Structure formats: structure tokens, C-alpha cells
């Protein structure tokens, strides 16, 4: 193990090395970490699984004792669980009997009360059925009227579409902007852009076109300024 992490208790001192004079006999200082720590051999004691202890043990008898103890503990647990399950079963049977008795008593009381309420329930049921039939009839009439109105609107719209789609039956002029008689060709989205048809009219120009290496004095710049700036 390295001792580089330990503090330095013996710094460099002169006087005793070769080529140095004897200054004096300096006192020595020792640290407890520099002293020997383990100076005695340790031997196995009694009960630490020595060879003599292992020879004295009867491993077969110990194994048989452990097996007997395990069987005895298992039987004790089984008997305790069986007794607890038997007591639990008895308790559940008792609870079931009590609940059955309470249910029978409740049924008897319900039969007495139901016999008194049968007459009033029949009258209420008849009134509710009559009201329900009335509501159903009103809703059916409303639905029929609504369907008839929707049908009339659809027929009217269909006839309008037929008349608008026939140019012979449409009285609006062809140049108008109405939706029914607009037969003119629509303008393109790029009709009014700045640099459209820049090469138009090149053939009509004079053959003696001179090139000027100045964008400001060029013919294109002059025409552009005349058209869009002035």
C-alpha cells in the first residue's frame, strides 16, 4: 500500500549525509503511523471451525434434528391455519344467516307497503302514459312541418340554380359582374405585375440598338421611369 498520502514527518536535513559536515546529533521524531502495527501471529481459537472442531461434530445427527424441528413447526402452522379457517367459516355462516333473516323481514315489510301503493301507482302510470303520448304527437307534428319547410327550400334553390345555369333564360347582361351571368374571362393574378412582358416590342425597335453600360441611362430605365414614376 502506498504512503504518498501520509504527511512528511522527516524533512530533508543536513549534517549526516555523505559530503556534509556533522552539524549536531538531531533528535528523531516518529509517528504512530510509522510504527509496526501487527507484531503477533493470530491462531484459530476454539469454535472457529478448525479441523479438530469439524471432526468432533456429528453432522448427520444435526441434519436429522433440523428436519424434525422443521416438520414439527410445519404441523403447528397447519393446525393453526385449519383452526382459524374453521372459525372463520363458522363466522361467515353466522353472518349469512343473519343477513338472510334481515332480508326476509325487509321483504315482508315491502309487501305490506307495496299492496297499499299499487292503486296510486296505477293511476299515476295512466296519467304519465297519456302525457307521453301527447308529447310524442306534438313532436311528430313539429318534425313533419320542419321537413316540409326544408323540402320547399331545397326545391326553390334547385330551380334557381337551373335558371342561373342556362344563359338563354338569364336576363342579366354578359358583361355584368353578377354570379349568374358573368361569362367574361377573369383576369390573371399576374396581370398588373411590374416586370411582365419586358421583352415585348423588341422586334419593333430599330436595328441599330446600342448597348450602354449604365443602368441609369439605358432605354429600359428611361421607359420604366416614364411609366411608373412621372
Swiss-Prot record:
UniProt key word Nucleus: yes
Listed Basic and acidic residues bias regions: 52-78, 131-157
Assigned keywords, A-Z: Coiled coil, mRNA processing, mRNA splicing, Nucleus, Spliceosome
GO cellular component assignments: catalytic step 2 spliceosome; nucleus
Record has Transport as a keyword: no
One GO BP: mRNA cis splicing, via spliceosome
Coiled coil location: 47-82, 119-164
InterPro entries linked: Cwf_Cwc_15
TM stretches of this protein: none
GO MF annotation list: RNA binding
Location(s), subcellular: Nucleus
Biased composition (Acidic residues): 104-125
Disordered: annotated segments: 1-157, 164-183
Biased composition (Polar residues): 25-34
Oligomer and partners: Component of spliceosomal complex.
Family: Belongs to the CWC15 family.
PANTHER family in the cross-refs: CELL CYCLE CONTROL PROTEIN CWF15 (PTHR12718), SPLICEOSOME-ASSOCIATED PROTEIN CWC15 HOMOLOG (PTHR12718:SF2)
Task performed by this protein: Component of a spliceosomal complex that is required for activating pre-mRNA splicing.
Designated name of the protein: Spliceosome-associated protein CWC15 homolog
Gene expressing this chain: cwc-15
Amino acid at each position: 500500500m502506498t504512503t504518498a498520502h501520509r504527511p512528511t514527518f522527516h524533512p530533508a536535513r543536513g549534517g549526516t549525509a555523505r559530503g556534509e559536515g556533522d552539524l549536531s546529533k538531531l533528535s528523531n521524531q516518529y509517528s504512530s503511523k510509522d510504527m509496526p502495527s501487527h507484531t503477533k501471529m493470530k491462531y484459530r481459537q476454539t469454535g472457529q471451525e478448525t479441523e479438530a472442531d469439524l471432526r468432533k461434530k456429528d453432522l448427520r445427527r444435526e441434519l436429522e434434528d433440523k428436519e424434525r424441528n422443521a416438520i414439527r413447526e410445519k404441523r403447528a402452522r397447519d393446525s393453526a391455519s385449519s383452526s382459524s379457517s374453521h372459525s372463520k367459516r363458522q363466522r361467515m355462516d353466522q353472518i349469512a344467516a343473519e343477513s338472510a333473516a334481515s332480508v326476509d323481514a325487509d321483504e315482508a315489510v315491502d309487501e305490506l307497503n307495496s299492496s297499499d301503493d299499487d292503486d296510486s301507482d296505477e293511476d299515476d302510470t295512466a296519467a304519465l302514459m297519456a302525457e307521453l303520448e301527447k308529447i310524442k304527437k306534438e313532436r311528430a307534428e313539429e318534425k313533419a312541418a320542419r321537413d316540409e319547410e326544408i323540402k320547399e327550400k331545397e326545391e326553390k334553390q334547385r330551380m334557381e340554380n337551373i335558371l342561373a345555369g342556362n344563359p338563354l333564360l338569364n336576363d342579366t347582361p354578359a358583361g355584368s359582374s353578377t354570379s349568374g351571368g358573368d361569362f367574361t374571362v377573369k383576369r390573371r393574378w399576374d396581370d398588373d405585375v411590374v416586370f411582365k412582358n419586358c421583352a415585348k416590342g423588341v422586334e419593333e425597335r430599330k436595328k441599330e440598338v446600342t448597348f450602354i453600360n449604365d443602368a441609369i441611362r439605358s432605354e429600359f430605365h428611361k421607359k420604366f421611369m416614364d411609366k411608373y414614376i412621372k
